[in-house]
From Swiss-Prot:
<feature type="glycosylation site" description="N-linked (GlcNAc...) asparagine">
    <location>
        <position position="76"/>
    </location>
</feature>
<dbReference type="Pfam" id="PF10393">
    <property type="entry name" value="Matrilin_ccoil"/>
</dbReference>
<dbReference type="GO" id="GO:0005576">
    <property type="term" value="C:extracellular region"/>
</dbReference>
<dbReference type="GO" id="GO:0030198">
    <property type="term" value="P:extracellular matrix organization"/>
</dbReference>
<keyword id="KW-0732">Signal</keyword>
<dbReference type="InterPro" id="IPR019466">
    <property type="entry name" value="Matrilin_coiled-coil_trimer"/>
</dbReference>
<feature type="disulfide bond">
    <location>
        <begin position="249"/>
        <end position="262"/>
    </location>
</feature>
<dbReference type="GO" id="GO:0062023">
    <property type="term" value="C:collagen-containing extracellular matrix"/>
</dbReference>
<comment type="subunit">
    <text>Homotrimer. Part of a complex composed of MATN1 (via VWFA1 domain), type 2 collagens and type 6 collagens. Forms a complex (via covalent bonds) with ACAN; the interaction increases in abundance with increasing age of the organism via an increase in occupancy of MATN1 binding sites. Interacts with COMP.</text>
</comment>
<keyword id="KW-0175">Coiled coil</keyword>
<dbReference type="GO" id="GO:0005509">
    <property type="term" value="F:calcium ion binding"/>
</dbReference>
<feature type="glycosylation site" description="N-linked (GalNAc...) asparagine">
    <location>
        <position position="344"/>
    </location>
</feature>
<keyword id="KW-0272">Extracellular matrix</keyword>
<protein>
    <recommendedName>
        <fullName>Matrilin-1</fullName>
    </recommendedName>
</protein>
<dbReference type="GO" id="GO:0030500">
    <property type="term" value="P:regulation of bone mineralization"/>
</dbReference>
<dbReference type="InterPro" id="IPR036465">
    <property type="entry name" value="vWFA_dom_sf"/>
</dbReference>
<dbReference type="GO" id="GO:0003429">
    <property type="term" value="P:growth plate cartilage chondrocyte morphogenesis"/>
</dbReference>
Length: 496
């Protein structure tokens, strides 16, 4: 490691100070959350037919409660109603029944499944003709009040949904359709409002339905700029997004573990270390012979790394219907050992829960307890060959908000929109696709160039270039100070 002279260190410190004052460069790292919802008449329409087991219905109730928790509930804010259906329709509570969040949550806990058939069309008809009526607490149509129905179902309806859903949408009701398990996906599309990619959701089982609650929390949120309102704790920079915010630091500073305050970075360390985790799709559609090609792809990337305790560490996670850590960061200290562990990885088969894998990456793989190093660059490579069976948007966004560099690699039936959702900015440089597993080695070559050790922003390796940059910044700062002095002189003369 190069040792900086006293003069260089002084200049480096000065540059960092100037960058803090003048540079627009940001490194988003941490998010806060605060949400205020617009007035809404919201009716849940929930399938409790025989195919929904009691334990699964309890999962639905957890999902409903999580969405309700995020709302501003009140007579002049958001009102919530609940329609339960099977062969018949039962209104569990009307829009006017409960005016507090606590009362709503208690009412949800008391709901019991009905069993028997699946009359989804009848339930939607009840919602638009009865549940939104004046007598039940529905408010008059107004641009200031949203009318929303969220339908949750796990099967094929025994009646038609297309016409009644079209009438609901035409009357100004926004329809969301959530399908679980063996649901008829064409039915979901017939129910939902446009754009359908924002109004149709599918999960493989009720055990993961609560993952969708965050989506609806954000969908109902109308606060657009928490930074402008001052509802944040960021020390240097606040970046606003609907209902939330991201704390960041000026160039030359790093975000502390509290996600709010910043420290000047120190020379000779930081991003020269890389923690790299592979998230590998081991679903049934990959097939055993192609899974062996995926292993070679991983080893191809590993061969390009400087594996050591101080430079690159590698972790590996495989996912299908569940998530399995093959080995954590730091377990193996040589390329040879890493590649041997990759060769020994067994194929999981089953489903494609990419969202769950991304959440595992955030909650486990990049934690200190799993071998991640504070200050090391965090890189995730997600490899998949098909559409995810769970919701990926929240976890994908959070990974990027936390500063992880995310690459998305798709093969065959992989969905481009999902790859783009996962990939870091600029997206074109962080997502790759090929139609055939036999050509993934070409993607490996491209990735090798992308996964490089970033230059330490505090290292000042090129002193000539560095000094020129300092001089330029000093001149700019001098001009700004002169302009400020002139303004102060004018103000002083005005006062006198």
């Amino acid at each position: 490691m190069r040792v900086l002279s006293g003069t260089s260190l002084m200049l480096c410190s000065l540059l960092l100070l100037l960058q803090a004052l003048c540079s627009p460069g940001l490194a988003p790292q941490s998010r806060g959350h605060l949400c205020r919802t617009r007035p809404t008449d919201l009716v849940f329409v929930v399938d409790s037919s025989r195919s929904v087991r009691p334990v699964e219905f309890e999962k639905v109730k957890v999902f409903l409660s999580q969405v309700i928790e995020s709302l501003d509930v009140g007579p002049n804010a958001t009102r919530v109603g609940m329609v339960n259906y099977a062969s018949t329709v039962k209104q569990e509570f009307s829009l006017r029944a409960h005016v507090s969040k606590a009362a709503l949550l208690q009412a949800v806990r008391r709901i019991q499944p009905l069993s028997t058939g699946t009359m989804t069309g009848l339930a939607i008809q009840f919602a638009i003709t009865k549940a939104f009526g004046d007598a039940e607490g529905g408010r008059s149509r107004s641009p200031d009040i949203s009318k929303v129905v969220i339908v949750v179902t796990d099967g094929r309806p025994q009646d038609s949904v297309q016409d009644v859903s079209a009438r609901a949408r035409a009357s100004g009701v926004e329809l969301f359709a959530i399908g679980v398990g063996s649901v008829d996906k064409a039915t979901l599309r017939q129910i939902a409002s446009e754009p359908q990619d924002e109004h149709v959701d599918y999960v493989e089982s009720y055990s993961v339905i609560e993952k969708l609650s965050r989506k609806f929390q954000e969908a109902f949120c109308v606060v657009s700029d928490l930074c402008a309102t001052g509802d944040h704790d960021c020390e240097q920079v606040c970046i606003s997004s609907p209902g939330s915010y991201t704390c960041a630091c000026h160039e030359g500073f790093t975000l502390n573990s509290d996600g709010k305050t910043c420290n000047v970075c120190s020379g000779g360390g930081g991003s020269s270390a890389t923690d790299l985790v592979f998230l590998i799709d081991g679903s049934k559609s990959v097939r055993p012979e192609n899974f062996e090609l995926v292993k070679k792809f991983i080893s191809q990337i590993v061969d390009t790394l400087d594996v050591s305790d101080k430079l690159a560490q590698v972790g590996l996670v495989q996912y299908s219907s569940s998530v399995r850590q093959e080995f954590p960061l730091g377990r193996f200290h040589t390329k040879k050992d890493i590649k041997a562990a990759v060769r020994n990885m067994s194929y999981m088969e089953k489903g494609t829960m990419t969202g769950a894998a991304l959440k595992y990456l955030i909650d486990n793989s990049f934690t200190v307890s799993s071998g991640a190093r504070p200050g090391a660059q965090k890189v995730g490579i997600v490899f998949t060959d098909g559409r995810s069976q769970d919701y990926i948007n929240d976890a994908a966004k959070k990974a990027k908000d936390l500063g992880f560099k995310m690459f998305a690699v798709g093969v065959g039936n992989a969905v481009e929109d999902e790859l783009r959702e996962i990939a870091s900015e600029p997206v074109a440089e962080h997502y790759f696709y090929t139609a055939d597993f036999k050509t993934i080695n070409q993607i490996g070559k491209k990735l090798q160039k992308k996964i490089c050790v970033e230059e330490d922003p505090c290292a000042c390796e090129s002193l000539v270039k560095f000094q020129a940059k300092v001089e330029g910044l000093l001149q700019a700062l001098t001009r700004k100070l002169e302009a400020v002095s002139k303004r102060l002189a004018i103000l002083e003369n005005t006062v006198v």
